[in-house]
Amino acid sequence: MIGALYVVGPAGTGKSTFSGSLNEWLKHMEFDSAIINLDPGADYLPYEPDFDIREYISLDSIMSDYNLGPNGSQIVAADMIVSYADKITEFLEDLDDYYVIVDTPGQIELFTFRTSSTEIVEKVSGQRSMMAYIADAPLSTYPSGFIAQKMLYASVFSRFFRPMMFVLNKIDLVSDEDIQEVKKWESSPDLLNDAFMEEKGQMEKDYFIGILEAFKESNIMTKIYPVSSKDSFGFEDIYSQMALYFTGGEDNDTYREEG
């Protein structure tokens, strides 16, 4: 395995669609790519996983065995994934020259905020790991929505301490003007502050000024990667960041020859 990209983010942001579309784009560009589903509760996936945790973990069995409801069984299932880390590494053994896309559970807390999640990443891919935080483009057009998603992005980074991309998904649902405005907020916290004050008024001013200052000081205000999983717009930029981290910017074929 060249490296693993863990796709994380809140429910409804299009993580699985992004994962499947990126996997297909990499294959179309003639890169070796595989996709792993780590969501034991997924009823439907918009792709055919190469490794599927649902073959080992059944929510119905957990509910029956432990007398749990749907929510409790999801939590138990999320913690059980680490027990099958060896199965995942065994699957990866023959994928020396592959980029691996890891689609994580739909609800962000089931992966990011469980103690087992960092152990999974360490066992499966170690330092050959990076994160793609998937943000919802329509929500991000509101200053408050953008700030909230940046806070979640910071939370994910603080859990894993791996290279991370802020991926603005579903840009096909917003205008080009909206995307450019979000990019301006990213490059200038002052503009974001002004936009937030216009949206919310003065009531929360001191609180959010403090948050924006923290963003600036900790470099949380990082580059945005706008993408559309519908037409693969922006995927070349995602691949470029993966190649930059995993292979020093060399394409897969060059990496194979030298590595």
Question: Which functions belong to the PLM regions below?
Answer:
Residues E109-I209, F215:
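Conserved catalytic-core segment of NTP-binding enzymes
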Residues G14, S228-F246:
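Conserved GTPase G-domain signal focused on the G5
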Residues G14, A42-Y44, S140-Y142, L173-S175, ...:
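Eukaryotic short linear interaction motifs
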Residues K216-S228:
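Beta-strand-loop-alpha "switch" segments that mediate conformational coupling across diverse proteins
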Residues I2-V8, T13, T17-E119, G126-M130:
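Nucleotide-state-sensitive switch-loop elements of NTP-binding domains
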Residues G248-E257:
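C-terminal helical "lid" subdomain and adjoining coupling/linker elements of P-loop NTPases
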Residues R162-M165, Y225, S232, T254:
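Structural and coupling elements of P-loop NTPases
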Residues V7-V8, N37, I101-T104, M131-P138, ...:
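Conserved beta-strand segments of the P-loop GTPase G domain that flank and frequently precede/overlap
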